[in-house]
Design a protein with these regions (language model features):
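GST-like domain detector, emphasizing the conserved glutathione-binding G-site
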Residues: 1-91, 105, 204, 208
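Short secondary-structure boundary/hinge segments and terminal tails
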Residues: 28, 147, 194-196
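Short, thiol/selenol-centered motifs that function as redox-active sites or metal-ligating centers
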Residues: 47, 144-145, 180
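GST-like fold's C-terminal all-alpha helical module
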Residues: 58-175
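Long, positively charged, glycine-interspersed low-complexity recognition regions
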Residues: 159, 164-208
């Protein structure tokens, strides 16, 4: 259903939505509940700017995710199963990425570059969170939700960059985000990654 061969995909009535961040804004606008997009145009711009920057930063994180999580999972499949799975992906660059993850063809230079880029983004979030309690200002918005969805695990993924000494404000925000009831319900409903997230959340609370 998604021409890019990625997830998520949302079907709502006759609409098919395939871009995750615009999808979040659509859900916020269409469904009932506390609104995550501010009414003020300037404030709304700041939220969208942070969402866009988060999406761009997530590209480096995906390399680490493919290497650490997707690769080991795909290695459990036979070569024939893997070839069939990859052949179903419509975009060539996504097929190449999945193949690289499955065969562990990321070089140490590529992995180090990805870690450095993710670490730079952690530092950028930390600088903003030193000024305001949330990424786009004084209130919780879609910017925080999108950033947390992508970067909830940096103390585990890049501990050399995301730690109490280098990014204390990011860790304080992360602790708050992990403790939100919606986050806990989501992770409890998830499988292995959910359990990992719950464990990290508990560690953050203990370290507070």
């Amino acid at each position: 259903m998604n021409p890019a061969g990625t997830v998520p995909t949302l079907v709502h009535g006759k609409r098919v939505l395939t871009e995750s961040t615009p999808m979040c804004e659509y859900i916020d606008a269409v469904f009932d509940g506390p609104k995550l997009m501010p009414a003020d145009p300037a404030a709304r711009y700041r939220v969208r700017e942070w969402c866009r920057r988060t999406d761009m930063a997530a590209a480096a994180l995906s390399v680490l995710g493919w290497h650490s999580f997707l690769g080991p999972m795909l290695k459990q499949k036979s070569e024939e199963e893997l070839d069939r799975l990859i052949a179903r992906i419509p975009l060539k660059e996504r097929r190449i990425a999945w193949s690289a993850a499955a065969k562990s063809t990321f070089t140490e230079e590529q992995l180090d570059d990805a870690r450095a880029k993710v670490g730079a983004w952690a530092a950028e979030m930390n600088r903003q969170l030193a000024r305001t309690p949330y990424l786009a200002g004084e209130t919780y918005t879609l910017a925080d939700l999108v950033a947390f969805a992508n970067f909830w695990g940096l103390p585990r993924t890049v501990p050399e960059y995301a730690n109490a000494e280098r990014t204390p404000h990011y860790l304080s925000w992360l602790r708050h985000m992990h403790a939100r009831p919606a986050s806990i319900r989501l992770f409890q409903a998830s499988r292995s990654l959910g359990q990992m997230a719950l464990g990290l959340g508990a560690e953050l609370q203990e370290a507070a």
